[in-house]
C-alpha cells in the first residue's frame, strides 16, 4: 500500500507540473510576447503586434497585469507628443480600451486597495523639469489626476498593502512616496551620498537649483520589501543598491554592485534581491538575511533590463535588450541555485516584463 501511495504521489508531481506565464515587451519591434515556462523550457506562445501606426515605432515600454489576472496593460511611450496606456484582455490578447497619458509613460502598477493604476511619465525627450505620475481608473480607462514629482520619474511600485506608491526621479536623484488614497506626495528623499561631496569646492553663487539637483545616483528603479518597512533603489549612476528605512525615511545602507544596476526586485518570500546590471549584461542575486552577493549570472546577450519573479519565489525572468539588430532575449534563472536554466528570443529591445499566472 505504501509503495502504491508513493508511486501515485510521484505520478501526480510529474503529471501536474507548474507552468508559468508572463508578458514581455519588445520596444523596437512594437510587439509583446506571451511566454510559457514549464520548469525546464521557456517558449513563446504568442507574439502580439501592438500600436496603431505600422510605419512608426510607438515604443511599448511598461507592462503590468491587474491583480485578478483578467487584463494586462501596456504603455506606448512614443507619442505625438503624448503616449498612451492600452488595456488588453488576457483571454484574447486583444485591445479592450485605451487612454492618453503624459510624455513617455513608462512603468506602472495597480493598487490592490484603490484599484487605481499609477504610471510614471518618464519624459525621456523633454526638458529636464519635474514630470508626474498619472493615476488611472482601469475600469473606465480614465485619467483621474497627474501628481507632480521629479525629473524623469521611473520605477512605479506599490507596497504589498496597496497604500503607498513609490517612484524615483532619475535626473533629480529623489525618492517619492505617494499616498495611494489621498493621491498626494507624502514624502520626498534626496538619495545623493553627501558624505562624498566636497562642498568647499562648490561655487554656490553661480549655481541655480536645477544644477544643484543634477543627480550622480541616477536612480532608475524602486521596490518596497513585501513584509518589511524597507525600500530598495537601483542607483544606476553610482553602481549601488540604496536601502531606505521607510519608518525613519533615511538611507540605511548602500550596497555596491557591478556597473549599471537598472531594475531591482525582491522575491515574494522576502529572502532574495535580484538586480539587472545593465552595463555588464549580468543579473545579481543577493541573500537579504546575510546581505551577501550570492552570484552574478551572465545573461544570454547584452543590456540586461527588467525582472519578473514567480509568486513561488523560485524563478527570475529577465529581459535582455540585445544591441543593434539582435533579437531581444528572455532568460529564466533558478534563484536558489543561481543558474540560468533556459532562454527564448523575442522581438528587438526586450524591456518591460510582467508575470501573469502560475497554472497546473
What are these regions (language model features)?
Residues 2-13:
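Sec-dependent N-terminal signal peptides
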Residues 17-360:
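Predominantly soluble domains enriched in secretory-pathway, periplasmic, or organellar proteins
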Amino acid at each position: 500500500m505504501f509503495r502504491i501511495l508513493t508511486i501515485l504521489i510521484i505520478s501526480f508531481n510529474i503529471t501536474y507540473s507548474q507552468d508559468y506565464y508572463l508578458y514581455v515587451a519588445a520596444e523596437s519591434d512594437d510587439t509583446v510576447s506571451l511566454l510559457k515556462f514549464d520548469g525546464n523550457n521557456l517558449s513563446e506562445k504568442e507574439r502580439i503586434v501592438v500600436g496603431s501606426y505600422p510605419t512608426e515605432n510607438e515604443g511599448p515600454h511598461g507592462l503590468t497585469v491587474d491583480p485578478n489576472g483578467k487584463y494586462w496593460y501596456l504603455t506606448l511611450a512614443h507619442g505625438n507628443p503624448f503616449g498612451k496606456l492600452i488595456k488588453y484582455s488576457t483571454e484574447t490578447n486583444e485591445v479592450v480600451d485605451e487612454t492618453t497619458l503624459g510624455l513617455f509613460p513608462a512603468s506602472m502598477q495597480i493598487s490592490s486597495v484603490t484599484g487605481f493604476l499609477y504610471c510614471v511619465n518618464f519624459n525621456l525627450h523633454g526638458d529636464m523639469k519635474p514630470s508626474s505620475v498619472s493615476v488611472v481608473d482601469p475600469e473606465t480607462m480614465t485619467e483621474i489626476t497627474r501628481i507632480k514629482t521629479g525629473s524623469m520619474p521611473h520605477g512605479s511600485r506599490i507596497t504589498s498593502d496597496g497604500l503607498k506608491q513609490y517612484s524615483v526621479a532619475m535626473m533629480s536623484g529623489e525618492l517619492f512616496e505617494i499616498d495611494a488614497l489621498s493621491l498626494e506626495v507624502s514624502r520626498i528623499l534626496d538619495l545623493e551620498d553627501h558624505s562624498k561631496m566636497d562642498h568647499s569646492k562648490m561655487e554656490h553663487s553661480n549655481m541655480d537649483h536645477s544644477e544643484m539637483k543634477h543627480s550622480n545616483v541616477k536612480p532608475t528603479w524602486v521596490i518596497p520589501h513585501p513584509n518589511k518597512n524597507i525600500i530598495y533603489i537601483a542607483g544606476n549612476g553610482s553602481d549601488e543598491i540604496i536601502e531606505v528605512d521607510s519608518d525613519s525615511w533615511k538611507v540605511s545602507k548602500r550596497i555596491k554592485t557591478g556597473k549599471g544596476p537598472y531594475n531591482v526586485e525582491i522575491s515574494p518570500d522576502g529572502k532574495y534581491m535580484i538586480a539587472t546590471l545593465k552595463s555588464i549584461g549580468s543579473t545579481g542575486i543577493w541573500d537579504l538575511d546575510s546581505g551577501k552577493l550570492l552570484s552574478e549570472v551572465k545573461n544570454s546577450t547584452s543590456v540586461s533590463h527588467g525582472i519578473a519573479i514567480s509568486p513561488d519565489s523560485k524563478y527570475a525572468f529577465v529581459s535582455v535588450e540585445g544591441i543593434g539588430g539582435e533579437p531581444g532575449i528572455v532568460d529564466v534563472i533558478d534563484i536558489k541555485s543561481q543558474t540560468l536554466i533556459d532562454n527564448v528570443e523575442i522581438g528587438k529591445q526586450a524591456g518591460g516584463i510582467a508575470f501573469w499566472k502560475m497554472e497546473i
